[in-house]
A protein has these predicted regions:
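Conserved aromatic
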Residues: 407, 501-502
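N-terminal positioning helix adjacent to the helix-turn-helix/winged-helix DNA-binding module
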Residues: 384, 453, 460, 503-504
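Key residue(s) within conserved catalytic/signature motifs
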Residues: 60-63, 225, 504-505, 509-510, ...
Length: 518
């Protein structure tokens, strides 16, 4: 790939993934970024404010995968509920609760409907506080790793607050919400309403919701200028438009900084499901090790490792009701699963630097005999690095717990790789190199474990943390470790305090960052 990547390109790509997570067309968040900048221009805000608004608009929902599990547990399809409530008036709690209940009870039998309604009515405030705290905490951890300053980080802590004090988790109100986030609150809602309904409806909503949901001065600006801004959006390419606005001097990601950014993307992806924690990191490491077994140049190893970090970008577009389903997928569900490498390709190809990773990243489910997806590429058309990642994806996937099965023993996963190779599905050199790198066969290196005492945690604390990060309840953790529920809860609170987090999602991210997934 190109040796450097503009930070704006990287963050704009993350914005595309956030669109997927909310069931919106790609570039929706880019469009809202443009609206936000134009509002800053008309209002005469200084360069510091405009630069902060730019990054906040593109990163607003970067914590969204962190609480996808919690949303899906209650609503089933977390993407659908997000899409349905995206344009609703967050300053009107009664309207939001009504629509949330309607979605949550649709299609359920009467007895189950009553239970869901009762849960929402009794627990809505507590659940929302915890849910939105998760999103903000994860966003802050990820953005800190991208070296953003306090202005961006402070604004993102108010992602779910509202002008009138009806937001979460702190019910902040008025100008206690940072100006950049007040701007983004308005322009992201207006982009969605204008796109889904009409510019006129968006302008009307800005006026109707002023002083309740939005800063009234900003809402008035939108009422006055929104029609012209929507016309500009209609004829502008959002990707090019957003990159043209990137704050100068452009920050270039290269070397370790580029690897760090791509690892942020990997963690953003894997946070989506408790079963995926650390998957992309693990694939990247094993792919790099296998590439060295094959004698790849270090440049080729680096490209393969980076492609492996972002190969699953497309999973953000599919709900956890599919990824975490405990039973067999229907044909229709599996058809949707087969789309995710294509979606990875679509997101990466907008940036020339990231598009160079597509040769391996978007081909991770292809097979040498043409039986894979999404392009059905055969061996004679496949890149050897891509073949390595294909074998890695299978091996790593098999050795991890899934919703419908326990993890394979490493030896059983190795046997399955050999079987697929013998049937022509995997490239022999790639498959054998992966097995050697994973610790199987002649010349194999012993598998390296994670740190023994990450963060100074005891063995028992690590066990508790792993299970909590996977989404197990306190009772389930107690049963798994043969301790009482009360003791398990004590351990969880102690561990969270020790590592400096307050939510399951943040704990899951900490686990990934400190290589204690397994």
């Amino acid at each position: 790939m190109r040796s450097s990547l503009r930070l704006g390109e990287f963050v704009a790509t993350l914005a595309l993934a956030q669109d997927n997570a909310f069931g919106q067309p790609l570039e929706s968040q880019l469009r809202s970024c443009l609206l936000a900048d134009w509002m800053c221009e008309v209002a005469g805000f200084d360069r510091t404010v405009r630069d902060t608004v730019y990054w906040v608009a593109l990163l607003r929902y970067v914590g969204c995968t962190g609480h996808a599990h919690e949303v899906a547990t209650l609503f089933g399809d977390e993407i659908a509920i997000r899409a349905q409530t995206l344009v609703h008036d967050a300053g009107n709690p009664a309207e939001v609760i009504r629509d949330v209940i309607a979605f949550a009870t649709a299609g359920r039998p009467p007895e189950e409907r009553d239970q869901v309604v009762q849960f929402i009515q009794q627990n809505a405030r507590e659940w929302a506080t915890h849910n939105f705290s998760s999103g903000c905490e994860v966003a802050d951890m990820l953005v800190q790793r991208l070296d953003f300053g306090p202005d961006v980080r402070d604004a993102l802590r108010f992602t779910f607050e509202r002008w009138g004090g009806t937001g979460y988790p702190a019910h902040a109100k008025g100008d206690t919400i940072p100006l950049p986030m007040r701007i983004v609150h308005l322009t992201q809602d207006m982009e969605a309403i204008g796109r889904l309904f009409s510019p006129e409806k968006a302008i009307g909503a800005a006026g109707d919701r002023r002083d309740r949901t939005y800063d009234p001065a900003l809402a008035d600006l939108f009422v006055e200028h929104g029609g012209r801004w929507f016309e500009r959006l209609r004829v502008m390419d959002p990707w090019n438009g957003v990159l043209a606005l990137e704050p100068e001097p452009h920050r270039l990601l290269e070397g370790d900084a580029l690897d760090g950014a791509l690892t942020v993307a990997a963690d953003f992806i894997d946070l989506k499901s408790p079963y995926m924690g650390g998957h992309s990191r693990q694939c990247a490491q094993l792919a790099a090790d296998a590439a060295r077994v094959l004698g790849f140049s270090e440049d080729a190893v680096t490209t393969l490792r980076r492609g492996a970090l972002v190969h699953d970008f497309g999973i953000t577009a599919l709900p956890n009701s599919i990824w975490d389903k405990p039973g067999t997928l229907t044909r229709a569900e599996y058809d949707r699963v087969e789309l995710h490498p294509m979606l990875t390709e679509q997101m990466l190809r907008r940036s020339p630097a990231l598009d160079a990773l597509n040769l391996v990243a978007s081909a991770h489910h292809e097979r040498c005999d043409g039986s894979g997806y999404h392009k059905r590429v055969r061996a004679d058309a496949a890149d050897l690095g891509a073949c390595v990642l294909q074998a890695v994806e299978i091996y790593v996937g098999l050795t991890r717990e899934r919703a419908d099965r326990p993890p394979f023993a490493a030896s059983d996963a190795a046997s399955e790789l050999r079987r697929l190779e013998s049937h022509g599905a995997l490239e022999p050199r790639a498959s054998r190199a992966v097995l050697v790198a994973a610790g199987h066969g002649e010349g194999a290196a012993p598998a390296s474990g994670g740190p023994k005492n990450p963060g100074g945690l005891s063995r028992r604390e690590v066990d508790v943390l792993r299970l909590a990060a996977k989404g197990l309840t306190t009772k389930q953790i107690g049963e798994r470790l043969f301790i009482s529920t009360k003791t398990a809860d004590h351990h969880i609170q102690h561990v969270y305090n020790k590592i400096g987090v307050s939510t399951r999602a943040a704990a899951a991210l900490w686990v990934m960052q400190h290589a204690v997934v397994h």
